[in-house]
Amino acid sequence: MLLHIPGLFDADELARIREALEQADWADGKVTAGYQSAKAKHNLQLPEGHALAKEIGSALIDRLWKTPRFMSAALPHKVFPPLINCYREGGNFGFHIDNALRQPKGSPERVRTDLSSTLFLSDPDSYDGGELVIQDTYGVQQVKLAAGDLVLYPGTSLHKVNPVTRGQRYAAFFWAQSLVREDSQRALLFEMDNAIQQLTADVPDHPSLLQLTGTYHNLLRRWAEV
C-alpha cells in the first residue's frame, strides 16, 4: 500500500529548511547503508544526530502524529529518527530493499522497518530526475511529489531513486515499526477504518457502526504486537 500525505510543511517553512540545508556539512550517504545497499548508494546525508536533522525530524514526526490518515495507515509503534539526504547531479540510489532492523545511534532499542516514508523537501520543478521508484503488487510506481508532501510505503518494497540530472533533491526519510507487522493486514484495517469514518459521517446513528467498530478493534487486538 502506497499512501500520499500532502502539505506537512508550508512554503515558508520549506524555504527556511532548504536555506539551512544549503549551508550544512554533508557526509557520504553510504555510512548508513547496509553492505549490499552501499554498493548502489550515491548520495549525501546529514550525519545521524545532526542538530538540523533532529530539528526537521522532530517537527515531521510531531505533525504525522497529528495526521489521522497517517496514524490509521501506519499504526506506528516505534520510529527510527528521520534522516536527511541530498541528491545532486549524478546522485542516485539503485534498486535495493531496506535493512529489516535499524538501531538508532546511542539507543539500545531496535526498530523493525515495516514501513518506509519519504518527505520531499525540494520543489519538483527545481530538479530533473530523482523520482522514487517503488515496485509493488500493482507494478512499478514512480513518485515525485510536491515539496512538503510525504509518501508512505511498505519497507519490504524493492525501490530506487533515479539519477538527478539537474539541481538538488533534498528529502527526509525514516522507518516505522507498526503495531501490525503484515502489510496486507494493515491495509485491511486501514480500509475498514476509512469505511467506519465515512459511515459515521453519513449515518451516524446506524446500529451496525457499533458492530463494525468492535470488529475493527477485535482484528487489531488479534494482529497487534506491543
UniProtKB/Swiss-Prot annotation:
Cofactor entry: Fe(2+); L-ascorbate
Domain Fe2OG dioxygenase: 78-178
InterPro entries attached to this UniProt entry: Oxoglu/Fe-dep_dioxygenase_dom, PKHD_C, PKHD_hydroxylase, Pro_4_hyd_alph, Pro_4_hyd_alph_FE2OG_OXY
CC cofactor note: Binds 1 Fe(2+) ion per subunit.
Keywords: Dioxygenase, Iron, Metal-binding, Oxidoreductase, Vitamin C
One function term, GO molecular function aspect: iron ion binding
Pfam family of the protein (one): PKHD_C
Enzyme class: oxidoreductase
Binding-site residues, 2-oxoglutarate: 169
Domain of life: Bacteria
Biological process annotations from GO: DNA damage response; intracellular iron ion homeostasis
EC number: 1.14.11.-
Binding positions (Fe cation): 96, 98, 159
HAMAP family referenced in this protein's UniProt entry, alphabetically: Hydroxyl_YbiX
This protein's name: PKHD-type hydroxylase PputGB1_0905
Taxonomic source organism: Pseudomonas putida (strain GB-1)
